[in-house]
């Protein structure tokens, strides 16, 4: 189960607890994990420190874990500066003490973090703080995409150069990834195959599990910033899963 939004941790704890309790009381046999996606650690770590219901929120996390369910906090950090305050260090420590695991994700954003050195620093710092680098996303095709997006090839090069700088403990991260119609599509690189320059892609998640982790190819387009701008390579009319 995934709680996302918006930001579900905008909710008061008693409201969130109502949803959680209903899930726990249902005693679902196939429920093993609850994920909560939130940027609160970066913009308001006091949600876990001094807010009126901060202790109640942490107690709720403990309750989830004590029921034998893995609780994953999917924390959004866009820049290493967001990891530099004492408040965020304390908040991360308090969350981890509940038994919850923190995993991190962020889009690569033009004007903000389109620099491999920033990503390497951020991932390494996250490991030092006991949290797990998880995803580098491509900026979604919504909102101010024209301002924040970068070409897919540039996103891949940023990911690759950052990945080369970190140890294996930080190489849990995957990217650059687009959350698009087929599922989660990762850009593995740019290559020349049969005299054609192509993007090499794969689906980390797909509506049809049979297609997960199977490579596929798109025509190289130096200006493409999203999946819907890609066309099948090698003269094919559609991708193999369409």
Regions found by a protein language model. Give the residues of each.
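Active-site groove signature of glycoside hydrolases
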Residues: 2-7
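Conserved AdoMet/S-adenosylmethionine-binding subsite of the radical SAM
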Residues: 9-154, 158-166
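Auxiliary Fe-S-binding modules of radical SAM enzymes
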Residues: 120-242
């Amino acid at each position: 189960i995934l709680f996302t939004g918006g930001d579900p941790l905008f909710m008061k704890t008693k409201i969130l607890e109502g949803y959680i309790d209903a899930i726990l009381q249902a005693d679902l046999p196939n429920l093993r994990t609850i994920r909560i996606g939130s940027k609160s650690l970066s913009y308001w770590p006091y949600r876990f420190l001094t807010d009126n219901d901060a202790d109640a929120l942490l107690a709720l996390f403990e309750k989830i874990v004590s029921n034998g369910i893995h609780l994953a906090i999917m924390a959004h950090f866009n820049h290493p500066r967001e990891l530099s305050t004492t408040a965020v260090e304390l908040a991360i420590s308090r969350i981890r003490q509940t038994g919850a695991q923190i995993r991190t994700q962020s889009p690569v954003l033009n004007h903000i973090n389109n620099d491999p050195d920033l990503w390497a620093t951020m991932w390494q710092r996250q490991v030092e703080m006991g949290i797990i680098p998880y995803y580098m996303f491509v900026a979604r095709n919504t909102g101010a995409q024209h301002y924040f997006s970068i070409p897919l090839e540039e996103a891949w090069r940023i990911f690759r150069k950052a990945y080369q700088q970190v140890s294996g403990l930080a190489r849990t991260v995957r990217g650059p990834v687009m959350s698009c119609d087929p599922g989660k599509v990762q850009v593995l690189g740019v290559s020349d195959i049969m005299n054609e320059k192509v993007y090499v892609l794969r689906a980390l998640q797909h509506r049809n599990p049979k297609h997960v982790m199977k490579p596929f190819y798109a025509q190289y387009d130096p200006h493409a910033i999203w999946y819907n701008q890609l066309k099948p390579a090698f003269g094919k009319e559609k991708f193999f899963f369409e």
